Amino acid sequence: MQTKIFYLILFLLTAIFSNIQSNDFLTLQSTTSTRDSGFYDFILPEFKKKFNIDVRVVAVGTGQAIKNSENCDADLLIAHHKESELKLINNGFGLYRKEFMYNDYILVGPKSDPAFLKNNVSIESALEKIQNHKLLFISRGDDSGTNKKELSLWKKINFLPNPQTDKWYLSVGQGMGASLNMAVNKNAYLITDRATWISFKNKRDHAILVENEPLLYNFYGVIPINPEKCPNVKYNESKKFINWLLDTKTKEKINSYKLNNQQLFFTNIKK
């Protein structure tokens, strides 16, 4: 009898301990660029050290990350397409948005530059040249923040690419790394975020051709998921994370992150 009681108590203690352990993490739906650049590996150990809370990152395109958040598969969201993020808030799933850092987009292509883009052309002029000369262009085509940004830039020159009829425009449905590899292998043009480009090792004969334009700024926002819509959300832990992310020391940490002696993200937000 005593043996049965002992094992029952042991079982209950194990269940309680497991439940406590299982709550010591946050699920963060995220864009892929912050993961692929090594950003989370750089900053998240500091959060874990301070609060003893793990952050489990689910890195997908921004569109999918928002869908996952609407399915209540998140405590937090980090994305980089403000219009889509505000829609999540307006639909009641996100509570608010805090913009906390930025980098920028760039247009990369073959160093031979058949479109002659490197002569200080604007991004609109560059895309017009690519379209007019029907030069091979790779689009992520995955509803990510980068894909949405790219399409908005085509819209500025009153052009909507159609992969069915515009054979030079390849919509590949892939993440940033795979899309970059394809662009390099096919000698094609592509829009990418700078952080992923800096960390990308297979550049070969590709180079940055258009950069440093206000139109190409890339802003990142963090959004806590609404516990009234998603009862399992760990809201108190989410608040801790956001307050920590916006803290001066964390901003200094983010600004210090470099690869190849180049800063990847900036917390002094430009407007």
Question: How should each PLM-predicted stretch be described?
Answer:
Residues 76-102:
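Acidic, polar ligand-binding/catalytic clefts
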Residues 1-7:
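Bacterial N-terminal signal peptides that target proteins for export
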Residues 7-16:
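Bacterial N-terminal signal peptides
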Residues 23-50, 63, 67, 73, ...:
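Exported/periplasmic ABC-transporter solute-binding proteins
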Residues 107:
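Serine endopeptidase catalytic core focused on the charge-relay Asp
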Residues 18-22:
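Boundary at the C-terminal end of the N-terminal hydrophobic targeting segment
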